[in-house]
């Protein structure tokens, strides 16, 4: 009898360990996009000296989607930025696509008279129209034989001076790779030619703790209505990594680090990162239920 009880307990431990290992493994679907800001893709042409870059990761979290992003801009009054939006997919010089999200930024965002550097994250609820749309669009836009060969997600930046309807800069986001998905299609340049940048790493731990993330399907409110606290960058077609370095890990959710020793700039891919903490928290109730169920079966036997 004692042997049977010991064997039962041993089986329970194996079952729980296996369940825990599957539940907490880092198997989140992640799609990575990168782009540079400029004026050439704007619907209404503008001339300015804004330079910068953008990183975006779309991850599957708890049945919905989480957008983690960062932008770095120079040549713009960061305190004048009124609104940053994620839109598309659409070809350059056109407005289109059903995705329309206003992006909030976290407290580490740097706003000065010459630059805007910041990042954040936003969640889209499961079973929402936006969530369904994103799911299908990701399949289409990341396929090598995609109908979206000339269309991408894009980010626009508006200022108080120019107005919300007149973005001063735009970044077409090129698909660079994915992880834990059956789809490993290639990205496409805005001109339609195939040119896939190197795949970047996973979401950093700072992205999963952003206090400004939203769990609703609608877009969050724009950054503050006062020029002193609202984030908004302008752009040109080249990135300026040398002047945009800060100590914040949220600047590059794609895991890209830049170093500027003298006049040289290098990039290295980060291979570390942590899974969104919400995934672990959401699985705990299930783990407890499974434990109780298995114990009940043992007692009844």
Curated annotation (Swiss-Prot):
Keywords: Glycoprotein, Membrane, Signal, Transmembrane, Transmembrane helix. It is found in: Membrane. GO terms for cellular component: membrane. Residues 26-279 are extracellular. The keyword Endoplasmic reticulum does not apply. Residues 204-234, 254-281 have a biased composition (Low complexity). The chain crosses the membrane at residues 280-300. Residues 1-25 form the signal peptide. This is Uncharacterized transmembrane protein DDB_G0282061.
